A protein has these predicted regions:
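Active-site bordering "gate/hinge" segments
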Residues: 1-282
Length: 282
């Protein structure tokens, strides 16, 4: 809508949006790693990550009063500011969560029984990943460099670069390990954004939308590329609106990853993609 209205959110709003997006990524990546640990019966990491995921969700609640970040953004900017006390609280919580996350997740890589289940399970080659159009961590775990934050940087990602994390083996381990690498990058990004948070307005006014126009918007969600397409009619009202979730692109990847696998490997492969039924049907 901002593109259709020919406006840009203020710099401070863009920073806050970036922080919120990476907090969402942190909560879900940590939750996924905990679930993968649970699927192989490794309860220490499964239990720790369940609690740590809540820590990241509570940071989102500190931003806007909702653990899932609802009502934070608005057309033209954001609804909530990050003042001094909130900033200091976020930095303190982030440091504690970073330490706890590292302790919990590194247990996985140090466990031979976990690694024997993760490695070589559900392989997707880079060639296949490219042919079927995988996106997000699933694509990057197969060595396919594809990330909206790098390929089409917008908002806060124009000011602060997030390194793209890839792995080459394309198995359950790779999809788990890419999440761990991205967790570390997201924490560094949030810390940098908080320390360099600019002053200024939180939002701008929104004029009428351009008539008879089409806009394509891309965001790198925690599952991968999210695409919104909007078309307006002659009066500037929506004529068509379509959302494409990462699950739409990645479901065939899960199907291919399961070929030739043991039945006991299904939960691992399934959770390593962690797709959305509702997202696929959008």
């Amino acid at each position: 809508m901002e593109a259709l209205a020919r406006i840009h959110a203020p710099a401070k709003a863009q920073f806050i949006r970036g922080i919120a997006l990476e907090l969402e990524r942190l909560a879900n990546h940590v939750g996924d790693l905990g679930a993968l640990a649970g699927d192989v019966g490794y309860l220490p990491t499964a239990s720790f990550c369940g609690r740590i995921r809540g820590d990241y969700l509570n940071m989102s609640a500190l931003l806007c009063g909702n653990r899932f970040g609802r009502d934070l953004t608005r057309v033209g900017g954001v609804r909530f500011d990050i003042d001094g006390p909130v900033k200091e609280s976020l930095l303190t919580r982030l440091e504690a969560a970073e330490r706890d996350t590292a302790s919990a997740v590194n247990l996985l890589w140090d466990s031979s029984s976990v690694m024997s289940r993760f490695e070589d399970a559900g392989r997707i080659s880079e060639e296949v990943a490219r042919e079927i159009g995988l996106v997000g961590p699933a694509a990057r775990a197969s060595g396919l460099g594809r990330d909206v934050r790098t390929d089409f940087p917008k908002g806060a990602y124009r000011y602060s670069h997030v390194p793209m994390c890839t792995w080459s083996t394309g198995d359950v381990f790779a999809r788990a390990y890419v999440r761990w690498l991205e967790i570390q990058n997201s924490i560094r990004f949030i810390r940098e954004e908080l320390q360099e948070l600019p002053e200024g307005a939180l939002h701008v006014s929104v004029p009428a939308l351009m008539p008879e126009s089409i806009v394509v918007s891309l965001v790198e969600g925690w599952r991968g590329e999210i695409c919104h397409v909007a078309i307006t009619d002659e009066s500037g009202k929506f004529h068509r609106y379509k959302v494409v979730d990462p699950s739409f692109h990645n479901w065939s990847g899960l199907a291919l990853a399961l070929r030739g696998q043991e039945i006991s490997d299904f939960p691992l492969c399934n959770k390593s993609f962690n797709l959305s039924y509702a997202g696929f049907d959008l």
